[in-house]
Amino acid sequence: MRILFVAAECAPFAKVGGMGDVVGSLPKVLKALGHDVRIFMPYYGFLNSKLDIPAEPIWWGYAMFNHFAVYETQLPGSDVPLYLMGHPAFDPHRIYSGEDEDWRFTFFANGAAEFSWNYWKPQVIHCHDWHTGMIPVWMHQSPDISTVFTIHNLAYQGPWRWKLEKITWCPWYMQGDSTMAAALLYADRVNTVSPTYAQQIQTPTYGEKLEGLLSFISGKLSGILNGIDVDSYNPATDTRIVANYDRDTLDKRLNNKLALQKEMGLEVNPDRFLIGFVARLVEQKGIDLLLQILDRFLSYSDAQFVVLGTGERYYETQLWELATRYPGRMSTYLMYDEGLSRRIYAGSDAFLVPSRFEPCGITQMLALRYGSVPIVRRTGGLVDTVFHHDPRHAEGNGYCFDRYEPLDLYTCLVRAWESYQYQPQWQKLQQRGMAVDLSWKQSAIAYEQLYAEAIGLPIDVLQEA
């Protein structure tokens, strides 16, 4: 099949959230399965320093009364063609840049549509989040081009009806209430990034006021769990951690813990229960819940706690003050550093993800990959990847709690801390987590099926397409 990914982000060179990981990884796996996969994204001002981009464009287009250029390069580490839409609107040195976002990304979506009509015609356009939401509307009258729309985060829905009509000149009845709603209405297939999240967003609690529409289109709505790049995130070969190891050589992992304790200014002690937390410091990630019980948990136990992330100033201040109250036991780094995050995955005993909601979640998968036992709230993709440890039957790969309540999180942390004291059992728990297949392979096969459904292609002739 000929598949064009259209997205605002692509890892590793233009990433803000999980969408970038998907767009940077899934096309490579689909390419290996024999499909002609290409990526279309904005030519941001910072990309020249990260990619080898030719000076001359391959094509000139016209959209929304503006000319634009398209440049061709390749996705790093692959032979997947990468098309960059060049226009002064994308020159700012950041992906999301303020009040003109609605116009910029609607223009980008229109440019992708023009590119597909006039330069390279795919069978399927795979659209990602609200930035590309108008593409299914414009492609609705193109019988030879189908669309698949992926919801990465329903909370961000794009410009609403009054502004969208002004930007696009499309009548309101073609738009829905936002670009997200327009995509849900007109895309041939819609999916989220985990099966559980696909069910949850059809309820008022998680539906962000679109639960009625999502229930209405449930026949074309599905959930496909994200994967991770298991070659890049491999504790046996990762050059950014102190000691390499695998699930059969877990004894070597201790060197990473001791090095992390030293790097973070903690007491260097192999017997301390070390918990890692890497996330944006916002309410979605459960930071408000954590702050209600962390002081009590640290005073009750001898555990250590490390935080890496940035976010809302109030949460940053609270975490910083807690770290000053527990020197040698808690460390807070208000920044993001990819190398340090990997060292936290490799050196922590457990990894906390207490999210209020989580479409998929990548950090718990990385924790499993590196042998850090995840402690999570059962929501979204966390339900599909982390299963509660049952010591009676040697089952599960982490610790889970259900209600978004301080007592539930506190109880779960205490249970994990107590279990850590029984090292033979804990190491088996780590090994079960490291044995989970977290690659993109199964997800890519599911996307193949989704594309086939979108274009009406029988699955038995999929490989011949």
From Swiss-Prot:
<dbReference type="Pfam" id="PF08323">
    <property type="entry name" value="Glyco_transf_5"/>
</dbReference>
<dbReference type="InterPro" id="IPR011835">
    <property type="entry name" value="GS/SS"/>
</dbReference>
<protein>
    <recommendedName>
        <fullName>Glycogen synthase</fullName>
        <ecNumber>2.4.1.21</ecNumber>
    </recommendedName>
</protein>
<dbReference type="GO" id="GO:0004373">
    <property type="term" value="F:alpha-1,4-glucan glucosyltransferase (UDP-glucose donor) activity"/>
</dbReference>
<comment type="similarity">
    <text>Belongs to the glycosyltransferase 1 family. Bacterial/plant glycogen synthase subfamily.</text>
</comment>
<dbReference type="GO" id="GO:0005978">
    <property type="term" value="P:glycogen biosynthetic process"/>
</dbReference>
<keyword id="KW-0808">Transferase</keyword>
<dbReference type="Pfam" id="PF00534">
    <property type="entry name" value="Glycos_transf_1"/>
</dbReference>
<keyword id="KW-0320">Glycogen biosynthesis</keyword>
<dbReference type="InterPro" id="IPR013534">
    <property type="entry name" value="Starch_synth_cat_dom"/>
</dbReference>
<dbReference type="GO" id="GO:0009011">
    <property type="term" value="F:alpha-1,4-glucan glucosyltransferase (ADP-glucose donor) activity"/>
</dbReference>
<comment type="pathway">
    <text>Glycan biosynthesis; glycogen biosynthesis.</text>
</comment>
<feature type="binding site">
    <location>
        <position position="15"/>
    </location>
    <ligand>
        <name>ADP-alpha-D-glucose</name>
    </ligand>
</feature>
<comment type="function">
    <text>Synthesizes alpha-1,4-glucan chains using ADP-glucose.</text>
</comment>
<keyword id="KW-0328">Glycosyltransferase</keyword>
<dbReference type="InterPro" id="IPR001296">
    <property type="entry name" value="Glyco_trans_1"/>
</dbReference>
